[in-house]
Design a protein with these regions (language model features):
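Short, surface-exposed connector motifs at secondary-structure boundaries
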Residues: 71-80, 283-287
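Divalent metal-coordination and catalytic microenvironments
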Residues: 8, 28, 43, 48, ...
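N-terminal active-site segment of His-dependent metallophosphoesterases
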Residues: 1-68, 75, 360, 364-365, ...
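Glycine-rich phosphate-binding loop signature in dinucleotide/nucleotide-binding domains
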Residues: 35-39, 74, 118-120, 158-162, ...
Length: 373
């Protein structure tokens, strides 16, 4: 059976004042074409369908458009679950109607197993939506201390007869890995306190595991335990990542994976330089983050940029503060140094220059006034 694995659609997401709905429809239409061309037989959506628990009417309309195209026009089933961004109860509204039209949706956890058949026999899909640890303790007992415990309980009575696919939304990892490295793009942590992580080895008995939650496409522990990632970047730190959707061809005793590249409506760009140079760049409709190297604030910089770059999103000043320097640490020796010497070291570290005599004089006056009380 040829399956399409999607996750983390985040329908209705915005960046600054910019809604991504137009960009998302552009990609969803590509996905509809992929479903037809590749002769997909079922679509899996592993959570975070919407970006917020109370999705806008526009976001609901776009998702309904996508689902209705699949189930009514292409006429293949959809199997979907809620993620930690979704409202499980809202998703479950009209669940019985959806099911009669082969849209199998698990908002709240109910041990849903959906069986589809191909020429090789049945495939059982276990729909295991996101649930909090608090919810897990209600369902499985107070001894659930983390997500590994939760999944052990959820899977302990599962029968692995025939071929089996798990669709779930979690942070699966090899416990030997560095556990923090995947969080980005403003992803919500799954818990406040406690462990967000689940041992991926728990999933090895499934023939395929369709994961959602992490935004980069990759596998964990075994190539059959896989994140599809988002179908478009949702932050500038992912601007250079080539986005894709994942096709899974599950045979009787075989598994083939194919990633299909996605074309974006607009690029994400980070442009660094002086204002006068950047404003001279060719016009673009890309989403742009500007990092200005000017020392002085440029008056109405964003308004000026938007005349040429209508999707300018953000302006940062490279030298405005040390906190604007991403992924760096301050490395200054502070032992046995005066306040003036510390300022000198800091300016040299931050701006790669020496204090001027005028700046030094002002600092001496300020420090003297402070010391005098």
């Amino acid at each position: 059976m040829k399956l399409l694995h999607l996750s983390d659609l985040h329908i209705g997401k915005s960046l600054g004042n910019f809604s991504f709905l137009e960009d998302q429809k552009y990609v969803l239409d590509q996905i509809l074409d992929i479903i037809k061309v590749k002769k997909i037989e079922a679509v899996m959506i592993a959570g975070d369908i919407f970006d917020t628990s109370v999705a806008s009417s526009e976001a609901l309309d776009l998702y309904n458009y996508f689902i209705e195209k699949i189930i009514f026009e292409i006429k293949i089933p959809v199997l979907a679950i809620s993620g930690n961004h979704d409202s499980a109860k809202r998703l479950d509204i009209n669940k019985r109607f959806y099911k009669t039209n082969k849209y199998y949706l698990a908002g709240e956890y109910t041990e849903d197993v959906v069986t589809l058949e191909d020429e090789n026999g049945p495939i059982h899909f276990f729909l295991l939506p996101f649930m909090s640890l608090a919810k897990g303790r209600i369902l499985f007992g107070e001894d659930v201390s983390d997500f590994t415990d939760l999944y052990k309980k959820a899977l302990e009575n599962y029968s692995y007869k025939d071929r089996n696919v798990l669709i779930t939304h979690c942070y699966a990892t090899e416990l030997s890995e560095s556990l923090e490295k995947e969080y980005n793009e403003g992803q919500k942590p799954l818990t406040i306190g406690g462990s967000d992580f689940c041992d991926a080895e728990l999933f090895v008995n499934f023939d395929y595991v369709a994961l959602g939650h992490l935004h980069s496409a990759h596998y964990v522990y075994d190539p059959k335990i896989r994140y599809s990632g988002t179908f478009m970047p949702y932050s500038f730190d992912k601007k250079d990542v080539n986005k894709s959707v994942t096709i899974v061809d599950l045979g009787k005793n075989s598994l083939d994976i194919e990633k299909i590249p996605i074309k974006l409506l607009r690029k994400f760009e980070v442009r660094t330089g002086f204002f006068d140079d950047l404003i001279s760049d060719p016009a673009s409709d890309s989403y742009i983050k500007f990092i200005l190297e000017d020392k002085a604030t440029i008056e109405n910089a964003m308004a000026k940029f938007k005349k040429k770059f209508p999707n300018a999103v953000l302006i940062n000043y490279a030298s405005r503060s040390v906190f604007a320097m991403e992924n760096s640490e301050i490395n200054i020796n502070i032992e046995n140094k005066s306040t003036i010497e510390l300022f000198e070291d800091f300016i040299e570290y931050k701006d790669k220059r020496k204090l001027t005599s005028e700046e030094r004089s002002v600092l001496e006056d300020v420090i003297g006034a402070i010391n005098e009380g």
